[in-house]
């Protein structure tokens, strides 16, 4: 087992057994049991949790390859907590503060690490729900990570968004990148060389602060997706299947088939804030033509109708018999009508 690579995890009882069906899971019967699968992996392990979790840990592990850091749930009520609570719509009251703090926990592990690790990777405590721990105990994937990864790694799956990316509004998420976000960085396993973690953590902190202040929130995976596009010099990713199951990455890694990529830096492109875009249409005596234009938008590129903050019809018509039809169409397509008589195309601009 590679002693230069340490896994980092944490486990807290956030009372998911009290949530509605579909979200409820027993802490003891599900999370603790799956956590024990991870505890049986004989690698160096840094664990965050409340005091009572230590008994579970050291029934299985020794102090030699384990560092337990007591971290109570009050720690998650940090400077972002109230902002998260004001934005969230779900009743999963501690879920978002916890998952969005994984990066901070990984960085804390870097600071307190007693093993002097060269690589650190966050791993969800219950990842064995979908990923066999045999990849770590038998298939030497930690050795392969150490050999192949020289940037901060995210495992990503392709995602064609319509309205959101894990709760983060789309296309508004593109405000923070110079490209269209079409992949999601998984939160179950991420990390890399120790000397990359502090930088990525700082970028993540700034991004969380900015997006929350702008009124946007998804999960940690939404922010991971943005980081890939913003900082390709610091990050890399390996692509898995659309179902998002992380085992695919470890299977490829085991067989020396995993590929690692970085996003292409787009240069100093101006970032377009879609919330500040307006659409202007100039028309003259032809409401049917205006209607046809809007129908073509609806069929071929609905973003023209959905994204602009304002849609304005500059009506240059002199034929007053068209007024009622224009009024009807503006209500239909959500346009604000401005009448200036016939001021021409240049005057309209």
Predicted segments, located by residue:
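GT-A fold catalytic core of metal-dependent nucleotide-sugar glycosyltransferases
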Residues: 100-155, 349
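A conserved hydrophobic helix/loop-capping motif in glycosyltransferases and polysaccharide synthases
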Residues: 7-15, 277-289
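Short loop->beta transition adjacent to catalytic acidic/histidine clusters or analogous donor-positioning motifs
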Residues: 5, 40-45, 66, 275-277, ...
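Short, well-formed alpha-helical segments that are part of the catalytic scaffolds
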Residues: 17-38, 53, 286-302
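Short beta-strand-to-loop element that shapes/binds the nucleotide-sugar donor at the catalytic cleft/hinge
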Residues: 152-167
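Catalytic core and acceptor-binding pocket of nucleotide-sugar-dependent glycosyltransferases
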Residues: 129-133, 170-267
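Conserved short acidic donor-positioning loop in nucleotide-sugar-dependent glycosyltransferases
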Residues: 51, 285, 314-318
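Active-site-proximal specificity loops/subdomain of glycosyltransferases
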Residues: 62-114, 313-349
């Amino acid at each position: 087992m590679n002693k230069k690579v340490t896994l980092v995890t944490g486990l807290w009882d956030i009372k998911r057994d009290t949530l509605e069906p579909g979200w409820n899971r027993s802490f003891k019967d599900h999370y603790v049991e799956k956590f024990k699968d991870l505890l049986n992996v004989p690698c160096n392990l840094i664990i965050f949790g409340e005091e009572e979790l230590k008994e579970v840990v050291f029934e299985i592990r020794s102090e030699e390859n384990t560092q337990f850091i007591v971290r109570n749930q009050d720690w998650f009520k940090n400077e972002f907590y109230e902002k998260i609570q004001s934005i969230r719509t779900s009743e999963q009251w501690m879920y978002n503060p916890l998952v969005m703090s994984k990066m901070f926990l990984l960085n804390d592990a870097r600071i307190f690490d007693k093993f002097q690790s060269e690589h650190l990777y966050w791993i969800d405590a219950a990842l064995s729900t979908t990923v066999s721990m045999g990849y770590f105990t038998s298939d030497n994937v930690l050795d392969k990570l150490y050999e192949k990864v020289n940037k901060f790694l995210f495992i990503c799956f392709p995602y064609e968004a319509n309205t959101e990316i894990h709760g983060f509004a789309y296309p508004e998420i593109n405000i923070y990148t110079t490209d269209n976000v079409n992949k999601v960085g998984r939160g179950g396993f991420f990390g890399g060389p120790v000397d990359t973690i502090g930088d990525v953590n700082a970028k993540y902190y700034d991004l969380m602060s900015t997006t929350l202040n702008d009124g946007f929130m998804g999960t940690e995976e939404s922010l991971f997706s943005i980081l890939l596009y913003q900082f390709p010099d610091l990050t890399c990713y390996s692509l898995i299947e659309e179902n998002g199951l992380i085992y695919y990455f470890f299977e490829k890694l085991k067989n020396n088939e995993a590929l690692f990529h970085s996003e292409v830096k787009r240069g100093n492109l101006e970032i377009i804030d879609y919330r500040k875009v307006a659409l202007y249409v100039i028309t003259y005596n032809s409401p049917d033509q205006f209607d046809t234009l809007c129908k073509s938008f609806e069929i071929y590129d609905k973003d023209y109708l959905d994204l602009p903050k304002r849609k304005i019809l500059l009506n240059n018509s002199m034929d007053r018999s068209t007024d009622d039809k224009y009024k009807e169409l503006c209500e239909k397509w959500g346009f604000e009508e401005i009448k200036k008589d016939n001021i021409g195309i240049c005057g309209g601009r």
